């Protein structure tokens, strides 16, 4: 079973979301997602300042196996991207919940968080796959 940190929220598309002290949210892909994709070779990051809606594809993770869209779990403005992934995309594999984050978003509608999964619900989703 993949590591599923209890303090995070999750999407059904295998993104995770963590609220930061400044009110923004950090987004990445789950350990389960990176295991399915395999070794990352490139991450196409979104543009800082871009406005996205929940469910929009806003980044791409390219691995030795496939390219997979990364979706915005909530609507808002992209306020930062993980530039370290340009030189070290493998951080998505080795540190999916820490150094391998993809982007930070300032949510425009926090009620959308209610549609995300908690760790227990995400673990149940993984068991059903």
UniProtKB/Swiss-Prot annotation:
Residues 24-106 form the Lipoyl-binding domain. One of its GO terms (biological process) is glycine decarboxylation via glycine cleavage system. SUPFAM superfamilies: Single hybrid motif. Binds 1 lipoyl cofactor covalently. GO terms for cellular component: cytosol; glycine cleavage complex. The modification N6-lipoyllysine is found at residue 65. Pfam families: GCV_H. Keywords: Lipoyl. Signal peptide: none annotated. It comes from the Bacteria. HAMAP family: GcvH. Belongs to the GcvH family. The glycine cleavage system catalyzes the degradation of glycine. The H protein shuttles the methylamine group of glycine from the P protein to the T protein. This is Glycine cleavage system H protein. It comes from Salmonella typhimurium (strain LT2 / SGSC1412 / ATCC 700720).
